[in-house]
Design a protein with these regions (language model features):
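Amphipathic alpha-helical scaffolding segments comprising HEAT/armadillo-like alpha-solenoid repeats
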Residues: 3-11, 30-42, 62-74, 93-110, ...
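Structural detector for internal amphipathic alpha-helices that build alpha-solenoid repeat scaffolds
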Residues: 8, 16-30, 39, 48-62, ...
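Short inter-helical turns and helix N-cap capping residues of alpha-solenoid HEAT/ARM repeat scaffolds
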Residues: 13-14, 45-46, 76-77, 114-115, ...
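Short, highly charged low-complexity linear segments
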Residues: 80-83, 144-153
Length: 175
């Protein structure tokens, strides 16, 4: 009951209030909130609210959250992209179809995003989805991780790629 009482607070003018409610609804999912949360991710003018929403949507396995999270990973500011990439791992684990759709954008973002934290999270998320992906996609991910582990300019992303390769049973594959 109390979760439904939170929903009107998502329309408050103060972004701190909206963000607090979004986090509360992420920790305590309310199925009736999912459409409003998606709307906030897509339209709220405050990046902190959108970031909180991207995080919270990981706890909603409703199909409608997949596309907005993918769009946020493509188009939003770095903090929102970072949490969108992590949330896509959770939503991707709901079904094979979700896993494939999420992984496609995660791999693209891994290749083109200029923010190391986002790229590292894309690697982490793809590792979480790895077992659900088809062999061709798994091979593409391993190839990309190998390139990153050997040649990336960002040490933190290189280390994440090495950790990913190790977790997939390819210890030392990048040496």
């Amino acid at each position: 009951m109390y979760k439904r009482q939170l929903l009107p607070l998502l329309d408050q003018p103060c972004p701190v209030e909206r963000m607090s409610v979004v986090y509360a609804l992420g920790r305590n999912p309310c199925p009736t909130a999912v459409e409003k949360l998606v709307s906030l991710l897509e339209t709220d003018d405050n990046a902190y609210v959108r970031r909180a929403t991207a995080w919270s949507l990981a706890n909603y396995d409703n199909q409608i959250v997949l596309k907005p999270l993918i769009n946020a990973l493509k188009n939003d500011v770095a903090a929102v992209r970072l949490w969108s990439s992590s949330s896509l791992a959770e939503i991707g684990n709901v079904s094979l179809r979700n896993a494939q759709l999420a992984a496609e954008q995660l791999l693209i973002s891994l290749k083109i995003d200029n923010e190391p934290g986002v790229r590292s999270n894309c690697i982490w998320s793809l590792c979480r989805l790895y077992e659900k992906l088809n062999n061709t996609f798994q091979e593409s991910f391993v190839d990309e991780c190998t390139k990153i582990a050997l040649f990336d300019k960002e040490p933190s992303v290189m280390e994440e790629a090495k950790t990913a390769l190790d977790s997939m049973g390819m210890q030392g594959f990048y040496n």
